[in-house]
């Protein structure tokens, strides 16, 4: 009970907004984290099947666009993106260039918008999980010349640039080619056990911010 109260003390009654793709849109890990940390409300802005990066036929749901219209008074905002950018061959671009048609540019444009609009919010970046679906695994090189780890590394680099905490699910989740059948329904989308694993990492991560 004492540990539960300690975990809840920081976020008890706070609001949390989640941005991302289908993994976040599923709403699987959020209730677990909310219960443990005491968030009063969770707003799920994720759009299934869409990347961070603008352009293409999924531009409508690009996280860089969707994030422009989130509530301006959220206490906590988390972004879990990158796996669809890998799958859809989005170029990384360069850190420091505000081109929303590249992963770096789209991500940093979103971050700057959120922090200018709501500088008091605690914003954190979560790397993509590993995957093994439809031939797209951690070894596959996409048409832009990148592996999935390159997008995960880009998230970490962006976090360093903006002094934002990064939850490295790519490295720490334990989801890999051997365990994906247990934690996902198809090598990509977490099942109940997968969402529990994400929550188990997210709870102490957010509690420590």
Regions found by a protein language model. Give the residues of each.
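Conserved beta-strand segments of alpha/beta enzyme cores
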Residues: 41-43, 122, 163-165
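Catalytic His-Asp segment of secreted/periplasmic serine-dependent ester chemistry enzymes
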Residues: 128-209
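Conserved SGNH/GDSL esterase-like catalytic core that processes O-acyl groups on lipids
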Residues: 9-108
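Residue-level recognition of the N-termini of beta-strands and the immediately preceding loop/turn
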Residues: 76, 121-123
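Generic enzyme active-site microenvironment
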Residues: 19, 80, 125-126, 166
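Structural signal for conserved beta-strand scaffold positions within catalytic alpha/beta enzyme cores
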Residues: 44-46, 125, 168
């Amino acid at each position: 009970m004492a540990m539960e109260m300690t975990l809840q003390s920081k976020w008890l009654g706070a609001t949390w907004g989640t941005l991302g793709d289908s993994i976040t849109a599923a709403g699987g890990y959020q209730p677990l984290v909310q219960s443990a940390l005491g968030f009063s409300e969770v707003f799920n802005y994720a759009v299934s099947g869409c990347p961070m990066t603008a352009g293409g036929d999924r531009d409508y749901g690009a996280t860089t666009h969707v994030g422009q219209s989130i509530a301006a008074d959220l206490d906590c905002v988390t972004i879990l993106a990158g796996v669809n950018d890998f799958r859809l061959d989005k170029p990384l671009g360069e850190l420091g260039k505000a081109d929303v048609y590249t992963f770096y540019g789209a991500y940093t444009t979103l971050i700057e918008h959120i922090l200018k609009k709501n500088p008091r919010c605690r914003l954190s970046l979560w790397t993509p999980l590993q995957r093994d679906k439809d031939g797209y695994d951690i070894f596959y090189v996409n048409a832009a010349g990148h592996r999935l780890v390159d997008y995960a590394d880009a998230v970490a680099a962006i976090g360093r640039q903006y002094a934002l905490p990064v939850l490295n699910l790519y490295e720490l989740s334990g989801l890999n080619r051997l365990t994906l059948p247990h934690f996902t329904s198809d090598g990509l989308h977490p099942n109940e056990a997968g969402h529990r694993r994400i929550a188990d990492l997210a709870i102490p991560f957010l509690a420590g911010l």
